[in-house]
Amino acid sequence: MKWADGKIRCCWANPRNERYIRYHDEEWGIPVHDDRKLFEMLILECFQAGLSWECVLNKRDAFRVAFDNFDSEKVSAYTEDKLEALRSNPDIIRNRLKIQAAVTNAWAFLEIQKEYGSFSDYIWHWTDGKVVCETGRTSSELSDCISKDLKKRGMKFVGTTVIYAYLQAVGVLCSHEQGCFLANQEAEHYNSYS
């Protein structure tokens, strides 16, 4: 169904939430190579586990402030006082385990950067730098492998479904639904420059 602006979008995009529409149109599925942005999306996807993405997206600005603009070095060094402040912050999701996982995952993220040169090089090596198009799934062999590897490295809240959503968000997977005005555009455009 066409929206008021004449475009067809993925069915999950909420036509009543401008933030969600902008996220769908301007971010989701567009390949990311910036490590800070990759860390931000990893943390947000981990917090989304068991919740709606819209809930997380609506709190994103507060997460940015609370988590020092997703600076992985700062997050990896959080003290118990900082963790307590996060657990008391009504503007973010205050799940104790997810907050602790953000610190644990920041440490593992930094270790991966040391090993691969960047987290971008790590995440994109799984597809040889190419965008993969697939829709209608919540996990895949790719997300299974990455999830298993990240868990082995000590990360938390990185099950295959979370990692699949992460890969979609950062554009490793192009999953815009057939009919969506963005379907396959990212893969065709970005793979032509690889």
Describe these PLM feature segments.
Residues 1-194:
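HhH-family (HhH-GPD) DNA N-glycosylase catalytic core used in base-excision repair
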